Amino acid sequence: MSEEKKLQFVTEGQADVEKQSEREEAIQGAIETERKKRVRKTLRDQLRANAIKKQKKSNRESAEVKKLNQLSKEETRYFKELEKNREQEIQRLTQFHKDKDYEYEKKRQQLLSRSPDKQSGKPDTLSSNQNNGSTERVILKVKNKNRPRLVVKK
């Protein structure tokens, strides 16, 4: 609250400064008490105002915390783009693996069709003669149900 200046005036014809200052203080005191009576709130009003003030403070603090935890539009867009890129990469790798599986199956079928063991009914092992005359055994090992692998042993 701003402090009000005390009334300082000297009435005409009075030379007694002490009495004049006492009168000024009395008048100033009366003015102050009257002002306080007008400004003074009831207990109910004071409690209500205090509750409103605390609620506003609480709302401000919770808004600050929410603002800190909330992602901005740029951050949201960035994370959506990351997710989109991740999905595209997964699709690309899935297609790559499908293509490689197809190539593998094609080579496997070619090897099986050339194999003399085809008639004996052994699809797991293959033998073939190379130019140097050595015999190699090709063994199919299924490590993953979706991707069998060829292992060549001499």
From Swiss-Prot:
<feature type="region of interest" description="Disordered">
    <location>
        <begin position="98"/>
        <end position="154"/>
    </location>
</feature>
<feature type="compositionally biased region" description="Basic and acidic residues">
    <location>
        <begin position="16"/>
        <end position="26"/>
    </location>
</feature>
<dbReference type="InterPro" id="IPR019331">
    <property type="entry name" value="FAM192A/Fyv6_N"/>
</dbReference>
<feature type="compositionally biased region" description="Basic and acidic residues">
    <location>
        <begin position="58"/>
        <end position="68"/>
    </location>
</feature>
<protein>
    <recommendedName>
        <fullName>Protein FYV6</fullName>
    </recommendedName>
</protein>
<feature type="compositionally biased region" description="Basic and acidic residues">
    <location>
        <begin position="98"/>
        <end position="108"/>
    </location>
</feature>
<feature type="region of interest" description="Disordered">
    <location>
        <begin position="1"/>
        <end position="30"/>
    </location>
</feature>
<dbReference type="Pfam" id="PF10187">
    <property type="entry name" value="FAM192A_Fyv6_N"/>
</dbReference>
<feature type="region of interest" description="Disordered">
    <location>
        <begin position="48"/>
        <end position="68"/>
    </location>
</feature>
<keyword id="KW-0158">Chromosome</keyword>
<keyword id="KW-0539">Nucleus</keyword>
<feature type="compositionally biased region" description="Polar residues">
    <location>
        <begin position="125"/>
        <end position="135"/>
    </location>
</feature>
<dbReference type="GO" id="GO:0005634">
    <property type="term" value="C:nucleus"/>
</dbReference>
<comment type="function">
    <text>Involved in telomere length regulation and promotes fully efficient non-homologous end-joining (NHEJ) by a mechanism activated in postdiauxic/stationary phase.</text>
</comment>
<keyword id="KW-0779">Telomere</keyword>
<comment type="similarity">
    <text>Belongs to the FYV6 family.</text>
</comment>
<dbReference type="GO" id="GO:0000781">
    <property type="term" value="C:chromosome, telomeric region"/>
</dbReference>
<feature type="compositionally biased region" description="Basic residues">
    <location>
        <begin position="140"/>
        <end position="154"/>
    </location>
</feature>
